[in-house]
Amino acid sequence: IEYLKECLPSMDQDPAKRLRKILEKRGVTFHLQSAATAIINKTVLFEHKGENQTVESDLILMATGRTPNTNGIGLDTVGIDYDRHGIKTDDNLMTSVPDIYAIGDVNGRQMLAHAAEMQGRQVVDHLLGIKRHYRPDLVPSAVFTYPELAAVGPTEQQLKAEGRKYKVYKSSFRSNGRAVLMCTTEGLVK
């Protein structure tokens, strides 16, 4: 049950849609543009286009996104500015209190371990007077499904929305020798 038009809305929609179709062939049912309204035992109630529906399941996994875990870490005590999106920081990841930095999940930027590592390096470099240009748009992300879905850089939809010129290159795994030998030709590189 997905609220938006496509599963994996933060990923490029071309490979996300392709993954959805592969999973549907394997028996996964998607209810897109639907809003879960309640869970009663093993039944999920949801609304789709104004119509109430239900789905029964042996197991329910609810993924509602990530939120910065800033509760109970004393932000108010030291006067650090934050909101529901996380601790507010400048370009060097310094908080509203000089010499206190926020990296990783608490700043609400990219909630990925390797992004936190890069942010940590950025802070250390800043403290040492080394200029580092951190490119959050080039932090890779992955969805560990089969086949896997991975991305780095902006999506085609983001580029269109920003009015940026771009070229799209695609290569099917059907032309990849390793994929052919392993009988895993469903993938693509975009």
Segments (PLM) and residue ranges:
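Rossmann-like dinucleotide-binding cores of NAD(P)H-dependent redox enzymes
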Residues: I1-N41, L45-E51, Q110-E117, D125-Q158
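A short, glycine/Asx- and small/polar-enriched loop/turn
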Residues: I40-K42, V97, C183-G187
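Glycine-rich phosphate/pyrophosphate-binding beta-alpha loops
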Residues: D105-L112, T145, R174-L181
